[in-house]
Amino acid sequence: MIFVTGCARSGTSFITRLLKIHGCYLGPENRVNVLYENVSVRENIVKSILMRIDADPLGQYPLPSLDDLPAWPGLRKQVLTFLGIGTKPAYKDAKLTLLWPLFRDAFPEAKWVLVRRDKQKIIESCMRTSFMRKCRDWGHWVDEHEQRFEKMRDQLDLVEVWTDSVISNPYAFSSVAKHCGLDLNVLGIERSVDHKKWHRSDVHANT
């Protein structure tokens, strides 16, 4: 199992797209949206957990404390049921950063991909994005995520990847491919990168 997460607006969708190109399975086509999210897992599991503890289901404000996470029996079975059967299953959701201990316990063998982006670029992207409206201080919001990243590094089988680095140099994805047991497809990465869109807007950084 592969989990992809990071701050929203970091490029998690782009990195997940690359994982799909490398052969990862995201679920039945009718359950996966244009952001490479398995909507069934997101709506029925991730958002349900957040709402159970009165946290924002969009992962904006308020954020949950890791100490408040509820027990969620059957989490592994539920996730796998919504994903279906496929080689190299993967699930991407920026909100996994807020719930990672639950998914670590349910999937102790999982490989994690932590997507990174410059803090100021994330803040600017949040301020330009119509649905990012609940938080008044995006800088503090990014800091809250980065505090969680520190614990994730210590407790998860995790690799970090900076989206801008992959945009500039496809070989920067090699650490992700190796970590996830995939053969690096440089040509596939090059064909997936639209440099004009990345620098002009947040098309690839939508979550």
Feature roles, as predicted:
Residues M1-G74, H195-S201:
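PAPS-dependent sulfotransferase catalytic core
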Residues I15, L98, I122-I123, D202, ...:
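A periodicity- and composition-biased signal for non-globular, repetitive helical segments
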Residues G27-R31, W138, C180-S192:
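Short, surface-exposed acidic
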Residues S40-R42, L63-P64, E124-S130, Q147-Q155, ...:
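Low-complexity, flexible helical/coil segments
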Residues N44-S48, A71-Q78, D137, S175, ...:
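Exposed alpha-helical structural elements
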Residues L58-Y91, R116:
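A basic- and aromatic-enriched beta-loop-alpha substructure that forms the phosphate/nucleotide-
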Residues L80-N185:
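PAPS-dependent sulfotransferase catalytic domain
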Residues N185-T207:
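C-terminal accessory extensions appended to soluble enzyme cores
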